[in-house]
Amino acid sequence: DEVYHPIYKLADCQKSTKVFKKGTTTHYEHSEGFEFDLTVSQDSTFMDDWDDFCVVAKEEDRTVLLTSTYPIMSVEVNFYGGISVSEEENKKNLVISHSMPMHISYRNTGFLVELDSTGTPEEMGIEGTVRMLDTITFNGVTYDSVFAIMDMAHYDALNYNEKIESDTAFLYFSKTAGILRLETTDGTSFTIKEGGDNE
């Protein structure tokens, strides 16, 4: 059996998400009544090696951490390389991969979308898991072109998981403002509050 050695790189849109620039701070209001700041404290790109049946791959990944010192909490954003740059694919006329996923997680709630070449979220799997809202207002500020992304616990690539006993959660995401609202499957949430002060 021949072993295949693909190399997967990040797309430009995965590398250049301006809303996750290191040092950027955003103010939020939690559903339990307190306010806090999330700051991009880490932004690292690295090569990850993995293997599967007849495949030994190198994958360029990017991890961004948004952290709060009080309360202590963090949101993790991962971009996984899916643009194949392998010489083997060119020589053997294999299908060229063009996957550009973004995964955002907080505690045990995760959200996964495919990005297009402009960084716009798209559905991965079944319909209804990503909705585009023309406008939505949070804490008195109206945002345009917001994406409502369903949490991963309630669907797989083909079906909704109707027997899940937790709440359906949504991530409200803007390409220009980042995370506007993050809901968890245990019923809590936090929402952007522009002009807020955590001092």
Predicted regions and their residues:
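Conserved functional acidic sites
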Residues: 1-199
